[in-house]
C-alpha cells in the first residue's frame, strides 16, 4: 500500500541479519539469568530475553558470510545455544531469521489512508520500541478518527497524526540505531558512541507540532505516570480522554460540558502529586 501511494522511506542505513530462537526451559536446575542481557561478545553479539514462565529467547547476530539456511539449521542452533544449555535442557520451539531496518516513511497520511506500525517505520530491536511505537500510532489515531466520525471535530484534526507521530518515531529509530552502533562498538573493543547509545544529550521526544494549547514549559511533553498505592496512575485514568486537574482548579460548567461531549473524564489530584505541573 505504501508503495502504491508513492510514499518513500527515509533510510538511516542500519541493516543487520539476526536469527531468533524461542525455547522452553526443560531443566529447572539450569542456571540462567532472570534479566534481559546484551552480550557484546567480539566473537558474536547475542541478546538473551527471559520470558514468561519457562520461555527463554536468544537472538544471534549473523557473522560475515553466514547464510540464512545455515543459521536456521537445527545443528547450528544447537551449537549457538551450547554455552547456555543442551538440547535436553532447552526445547527449541521456533527459529526465525530476519533482517531489521531503520526506516521512517516520509508521510504518514495520504487522503483517507494512514500508515501505522511497520508500514510507517521499522527500527532495530535494541531499545524495545518497535511494537511500542506501533501502539502509539494507533492510540494517537483512533480517538481522532472517532471524533471526526462522531462530528465532534473537523477532518483537519487527522492531519495532526503525521505531525505528532513522525517526528517522535524518527527520534526513536535514531536512538535504536545509536544503541545498535554502541553494541557493535563495545564488541569491537571501543565505545566511541557510548553517550549517544545510552541517550546522553538526547531530549526525551515530545510534541513540537500538532495539537498543542498554551505555552507552559511542559506543553507537549509526555504525561508523568507515578505509582499510586493501588497501582499505576494510568489505570486510574481509565480508557479515553482524561482532564487531569488539581481539586482547587475552577472550571466553568460550559467548559466541562464541552469536555463531556467527547466523553472526557475529569480526574482531580493533589497539588503535591505533580508539583512540576502545578508549581508555576
Residue ranges of each PLM-predicted region?
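Core Rossmann-like FAD-binding/catalytic domain of the broad FAD-dependent monooxygenase superfamily
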Residues: 1-191
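Helical substrate-recognition/capping region of FAD-dependent monooxygenase/halogenase enzymes
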Residues: 79, 147-280
